[in-house]
Amino acid sequence: MLSLDYNNIFIYELLTERFSSENPSSIDQVVTDFDGVTFHISTPEEKTKILISLSMKCYPELVNYGTLDLLKQIYGAYVHEPEMGYNFSILIDLQQLPATDEEKEQLAMSISMLKRNVLAAPFHRAFTKQAELADLARKDPENAPMLDKQATSQELMAIHYRDEETIVLWPEHDRVTVVFSTKFREETDRIFGKVFLQEFVDARRRPAIQTAPQVLFSYRDPPLEIRDIQGIQKGDDFGFVTFVLFERHFTPQNREDCISHIQVFRNTLHFHIKASKAYMHQRMRKRVADFQKVLNRAKPDVELERKTATGRSFVRA
């Protein structure tokens, strides 16, 4: 199973090339990414100053969960006034780049992960709140169920990151739950989706990966905890995938990787659905071509009309 990259490869390669070039040139390119995200890379003032802007449907929601503070913490002095029509902008001065090639590469990678970092804030907030609830539960174990109930109602975060799809997450004293709602636009997609999701559920039975997050999925109706959220779609073409993350999954050492893996789940799922359909269509076309060859070989030879030199038809006696 393939894993999609967390960063935007086009932005990474473009910035890497510009950081190493001695002769900067003008840029004005619009780059699209998964989930309807749009980037605008331009040099509006000078060739040595690159402006990278991001437009994201759910950005106003994410600001409520601390995204702007997180982005300022990550990008620091590179944060710039947002370009008109975009939500967030970064300005890079090629004359004030880091000294070493390694630092330049890290900067290019960090900027190419802008979409990932924008979506990371709710996860950091949920992990921080979970730690607070865990401390309170250790002091008063009998009150843990009440703490979880309050957290589910007060700390539940919904991210409407696509037109009809939503990410919902909330902390409890011993876990963080993440729910993806996803739409299967075709009946074939729904069938393939069930197969893939069942593999996620069954995978934990293998001894080597029994410590993986628990995965649950359902169709038509969302889980009880999120049924009252405004904007949650439901129906025969909707599925709901739930990840249950325990403390061992988001320790300080692997927290960033956990966030990255969870974020790309939806796109990875649909990528593999489309790849599977393409593979089956390819195999079907090959099988049809093989059948056509067999039929062509089985055709009887057409007996041609023979004529004499004078033009009369020649009939075999």
Swiss-Prot record:
Subunit structure: Component of the Arp2/3 complex composed of arp2, act2, arc1/p41-ARC, arc2/p34-ARC, arc3/p21-ARC, arc4/p20-ARC and arc5/p16-ARC.
Protein name: Actin-related protein 2/3 complex subunit 2
Sample GO molecular function, one term: actin filament binding
Primary location class: cytoplasm
Organism: Schizosaccharomyces pombe (strain 972 / ATCC 24843) (Fission yeast)
UniProt cross-references to Pfam families, sorted A to Z: P34-Arc (PF04045)
Record's function text: Functions as actin-binding component of the Arp2/3 complex which is involved in regulation of actin polymerization and together with an activating nucleation-promoting factor (NPF) mediates the formation of branched actin networks. Seems to contact the mother actin filament.
UniProt keyword Transport present: no
GO biological processes: actin cortical patch assembly; actin filament branching; actin filament polymerization; Arp2/3 complex-mediated actin nucleation; endocytosis
Gene3D superfamilies on file: 3.30.1460.20
Keywords assigned: Actin-binding, Cytoplasm, Cytoskeleton
Family: Belongs to the ARPC2 family.
Source taxon at top rank: Eukaryota
Subcellular localization(s) per the UniProt record: Cytoplasm, Cytoskeleton, Actin patch
One annotated Gene Ontology cellular component of this protein: cytosol
